[in-house]
A protein has these predicted regions:
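Generic beta-strand/beta-sheet core signal
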Residues: 90, 118-121, 194-202, 232
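Conserved hydrophobic/aromatic pocket- or pore-lining residues that grip, position, or stack substrates
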Residues: 42, 108, 193
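Aromatic/hydrophobic pocket-lining residues that form the small-molecule binding cavity
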Residues: 46, 101, 175, 179
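Aromatic- and acidic-residue-enriched carbohydrate-binding clefts of CAZyme catalytic domains
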Residues: 124-188, 203-248
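Second-shell loop/turn segments in exported
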Residues: 36-40, 90-94, 168-172
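Short, well-ordered coil/turn segments that N-cap beta-strands
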Residues: 83-85, 112-114, 187-193
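A conserved hydrophobic secondary-structure block that centers on an alpha-helix together
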Residues: 87-123, 127
Length: 248
């Protein structure tokens, strides 16, 4: 019947009397005669109206999703005060699975956050596979006990002795397919992914990884290729120590 209908509309939605990011404005109406109507100025506005409807549903709707529920009548006129509403996730120091990232994106969407600051690299890890530079993840994407860091980085942040991704959140990375999957998932929820690649500071994982690449290519007799992408200047004789105790 009409009371059970949900209508989605793209139109100029009325806005509260504040200075707002009007492109994401929406109106949510729950009416016993006409049903549920969500009107948004854009697709994002309609989407956010749907998120507000989810929040408005009684708890019974989640306890028994297939059972009928009574939805209280309401009219909501809403628009964001700030165009940029972000959340930051640091996976460089503590790796998170694709499934965990997607759960976070769902929570962001529910709270109408629209920018995901995805911290993919730092001193302690490089988490995005790059074609042609396997050491970035094979070396820079793993942490574990080591005497020379030639195969992987040393432990940090309680990552433990084992360098395998299955054993520690200090290890792991996203393949190209993983990353594209995350981008598509975010886009469907009107979230912009802002990848954060730290350079020139906070780049120790990349530096160590490129040193491993240089060693591999030199051992194969390709010194010229080994110099490409190297981040350490062998002629630099300066001495220093970082707050973490690193001198390389």
């Amino acid at each position: 019947d009409s009371a059970a209908a949900i209508t989605l509309r793209r139109a100029e939605a009325p806005r509260p009397a504040i200075d707002t990011a009007s492109a994401e404005a929406y109106r949510l109406t729950v009416d016993p005669e006409t049903g549920i109507t969500i009107t948004g100025a854009t697709d994002a506005g309609v989407f956010y109206g749907g998120q507000s409807l989810e929040a408005w549903l009684p708890v019974a709707a989640y306890r028994a999703p297939s059972s009928p529920v009574d939805v209280p009548a309401v009219q909501v006129l809403d628009a964001p005060r700030f165009a940029h509403r972000g959340l930051h996730l640091d996976v460089a120091r503590n790796m998170q699975s694709v499934a965990a990232v997607k759960r976070l994106l769902d929570i962001m969407a529910f709270y109408k956050l629209n920018t995901f600051h995805f911290h993919l690299t730092d001193d302690e890890g490089w988490r995005l596979a790059v074609e042609g530079l396997p050491e970035l993840t094979r070396v820079g994407g793993r942490r574990g006990h080591t005497l020379d860091e030639q195969a992987h980085l040393m432990p940090s942040y309680g990552s433990g002795p084992h360098p395998s991704p299955e054993a520690s959140r200090g290890s792991g990375w996203y393949s190209r397919a993983d990353y594209l999957d995350i981008l598509r998932y975010a886009k469907a929820r009107h979230i912009t992914v802002m990848p954060e690649i730290d350079v020139p500071g906070h780049a120790r994982a990349a530096i160590q990884a490129m040193e491993a690449r240089t060693r591999r290519l030199r051992a194969a007799g390709d010194t010229t290729a080994g110099r490409a992408y190297r981040l350490r200047d062998p002629a630099d004789t300066s001495e220093y120590e970082s707050v973490q105790g690193w001198d390389d």
